[in-house]
Regions:
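N-terminal Rossmann-like NAD(P) cofactor-binding subdomain of oxidoreductases
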Residues: 2-258, 292-296, 320, 342, ...
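Short secondary-structure junctions and interdomain/linker hinges
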Residues: 77, 126, 262, 277-281, ...
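Alpha-helix boundary/capping residues
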Residues: 135, 273, 277, 333-336, ...
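A structural signal for well-ordered alpha-helical scaffolds and beta->alpha junctions
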Residues: 144, 213, 263-267, 326
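Oxyanion-binding "anion nests"
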Residues: 262-315
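C-terminal active-site/capping subdomain that shapes the small-molecule cofactor and substrate pocket
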Residues: 298-303, 308-419
């Protein structure tokens, strides 16, 4: 038995095809029809890092999108000039979208994407923010910029899955089911840029493990007020390490109790996401990092031999006394409704609450709401803090490209993206 406020059927992925490379690419090309333009605006989008794991996921999500049209694909120099189907080692369980298969891969330079209205970045962190990786010209003067910043400076709207700008004080770090209001800082980001930008900005989505954590925490803070303390232990899927990822001899028959930088990301990102935006004396906007009600987060992160789906065991302490009961927590989680109405890729139900004692499980629950929702189970009293429970989220969907896609949809609906 599960509860989402209404009956929900867990969606399974579309039919699979064999995971072959470019030699058999023609058999991996999707022939599915697009939505008509009557479904919404026709917005040209580009994908950076299109041959990588996150880039491939972006293309799967964009293939039949009612608003966004795949217009440009960028990748590393070894792929530039090739048709996408011949450049990519396709690793998704659905075919290569037919819209992308014959597109010629472009070099990741802003001038090659200038006719796009939105750019999705699936670049690895070491490229997304590495000085000297990308070049472009203004008034014939060569400039060396951080890669994603170069696209912003070219007045392009960038939605990034990389970590590089998450700590920037003017860049929103958005989990769309949690803090879409943080898009309000974008005009300030544009105004502070030199020259001032009309259309360009950067929005980042959170680390995959942070995303699964903050959605239930947001639901609980909305229902019961501030949370004071969070203890979280993660069991993270190997797909979170990208491809080819963790060597098989390291992960088979094993658990690796360390993921570099992961714990620090969870502890810091949670504060920025769940915090608000305040105004300083000079009228500028600042992320308050949950300072009005200090929140402490302690994370322990582990890599486990699961392909997709991050599991997290969480204990929380509320500021309110007495704290809510386990039943009140279950009801609040099931009733949670995020501010994503009108977004085509947003889940109808953000959280499913399981009553069975052995749920959620990655194999059974990672495709809830097509991977865009979060599963919660084992809600019970905690003898050290107040309440403890288990979270399961799909790290390659809501934990990565799906979040970035919904962020872009929100930006369109709120008029942040100029179309």
């Amino acid at each position: 038995m599960t509860s989402t406020g209404s009956t929900t059927t867990t969606k399974r992925p579309l039919s699979s095809s064999s995971r072959t490379g470019a030699d058999n690419a023609s058999s991996l090309i999707s022939k599915s029809p697009r939505h008509t333009m009557q479904d919404g605006p026709s917005i040209k989008v580009g994908v950076l890092g299109a041959t990588g794991t996150v880039g491939q996921r972006f293309l799967v999500l964009l293939a039949d999108h009612p608003w966004f049209v795949i217009h440009a694909l960028g990748a590393s120099p070894r792929s530039v000039g090739k048709p996408y189907a011949k450049a990519v080692q396709w690793k998704q369980t659905t075919p290569i979208p037919h819209q992308a298969a014959d597109m010629i891969v472009r070099e990741c330079k802003p001038e090659n994407f200038i006719d796009c209205q939105i750019v999705f970045s699936g670049l690895d962190a070491d490229v997304a923010g590495d000085i000297g990786k990308f070049y472009y010209r203004i008034l014939d003067q060569p400039l060396i910029l951080l890669a994603e910043a170069a696209f912003r400076s070219a007045d392009l709207a960038v939605f990034s899955n990389a970590k590089n700008y998450r700590r920037d004080p003017h860049v929103p770090l958005i989990v769309p089911l949690v803090n879409p209001s943080h898009l309000s800082i974008i005009p300030q980001q544009q105004a502070l840029h030199r020259p001032t930008l009309k259309k360009g900005f950067i929005v980042t989505n959170a680390n995959c493990s942070t995303t699964g954590l903050v959605i239930p925490l947001c639901a609980l803070e909305k229902a019961f007020g501030p949370i004071e303390s969070v203890l979280v232990t993660t069991m993270q899927a190997i797909s979170g390490a990208g491809y080819p990822g963790v060597p098989s001899l390291d992960i088979l028959d094993n658990i690796v109790p360390h993921i570099g930088g992961e714990e620090e990301k969870m502890e810091w990102e949670t504060l920025k996401i769940l915090g608000g935006i305040t105004e300083s004396d000079d009228g500028s906007k600042l992320f308050d990092m949950h300072a009005k009600h200090p929140l402490r987060v302690s994370a322990s992160c582990n890599r486990v031999p699961v392909i997709d789906g991050h599991t997290e065991c969480v204990s929380v302490r509320f500021a309110r006394r007495p704290p809510p009961s386990p039943q009140q927590v279950r009801e609040a989680l099931a009733a949670f409704t995020p501010d994503t109405q009108g977004c085509p890729s947003a889940p109808r139900h953000a959280i499913v609450v399981h009553e069975q004692p052995d749920r959620p499980q990655p194999r059974l629950d990672r495709y809830f709401q097509n991977g865009a929702g979060v599963s919660v189970g084992r809600v019970r009293q905690c003898q050290v803090l107040d309440i403890k429970f288990v979270i399961l989220s799909n790290n390659v969907s809501i934990g990565a490209a799906t979040s970035s896609l919904i962020n872009a949809e929100l930006a369109v609906l709120k008029g942040v993206v100029v179309v």
